[in-house]
């Protein structure tokens, strides 16, 4: 396909945006299940607590779905000349798969290689301290393939640098809901919770990952070694 010869139209951008809205609703349902049930309190009613949870979820979803057209523009502007054809092919592929949305993240919607291509471009924004635009780009990768762990971590790092602590907390919670034994996410999530003095949370995440590695007989793996080192630094 001669991607560079095709015009990436506004209509196609809106098609992508509409489709990603369906998957965003699915993600919101996951997030609601991550919160602890409200408890009776003299300070806040059950309904007030539920409203606060919904506000936090809505805030995160605004982050997650903010301006698809902006993200596409950033990728096309940031990619090197030799990357442009590949990037356009990925976007056209996203449009061509519109009929295959099933109401949940599709682990195979965009391939690992294609995610890595986009992530290399987004990483330049992170390295260049352009965290706001980097966040746009990492979020867009997640919307194309929700099971690419580097994009979740990149998004979290951008929001952390922007000072959006509550968003970072929810990002890691949602990422670990989708990929509970992804050791890349586990290690970065633990580091974040240690940095905000939530050591019990960090230990719980690390221990869960460690136990899974033991179950899989991977005690000699690099992931096991790194988790052990992280646990030693916390305990």
Label each region the model flagged.
Residues 127, 161-162, 195, 230-233:
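Register position in tetratricopeptide repeats
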Residues 151, 185, 219-220:
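TPR alpha-solenoid repeat register
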Residues 135-136, 169, 200-204, 225:
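Conserved positions within tetratricopeptide repeat
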Residues 194-217, 229:
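TPR/TPR-like (Sel1-like) alpha-helical repeat modules
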Residues 107-181:
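Alpha-helical adaptor scaffolds
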Residues 1-114:
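Long, contiguous interaction/recruitment modules in multidomain scaffold/adaptor proteins
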């Amino acid at each position: 396909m001669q991607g560079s010869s095709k015009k990436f139209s506004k209509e196609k951008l809106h098609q992508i945006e509409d489709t990603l809205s369906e998957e965003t609703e699915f993600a919101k349902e996951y997030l609601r299940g991550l919160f602890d049930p409200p408890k009776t309190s003299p300070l806040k009613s059950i309904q007030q607590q539920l409203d606060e949870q919904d506000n936090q979820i809505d805030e995160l979803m605004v982050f997650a779905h903010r301006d698809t057209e902006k993200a596409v523009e950033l990728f096309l502007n940031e990619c090197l000349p030799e990357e442009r054809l590949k990037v356009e092919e990925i976007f056209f592929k996203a449009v061509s798969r519109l009929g295959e949305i099933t109401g949940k993240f599709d682990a195979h919607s965009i391939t690992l290689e294609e995610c890595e291509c986009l992530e290399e471009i987004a990483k330049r924004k992170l390295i260049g301290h352009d965290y706001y635009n980097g966040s746009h780009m990492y979020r867009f990768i997640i919307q194309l393939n929700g099971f690419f762990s580097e994009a979740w971590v990149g998004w979290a790092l951008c929001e952390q640098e922007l000072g959006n602590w509550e968003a970072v907390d929810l990002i890691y919670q949602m990422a670990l809901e989708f990929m509970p034994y992804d050791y890349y996410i586990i290690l970065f999530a633990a580091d974040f919770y240690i940095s905000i003095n939530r050591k019990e949370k960090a230990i719980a995440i690390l221990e869960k990952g460690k136990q899974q590695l033991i179950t899989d007989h991977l005690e000699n793996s690099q992931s096991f070694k790194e988790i052990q080192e992280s646990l030693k630094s916390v305990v």
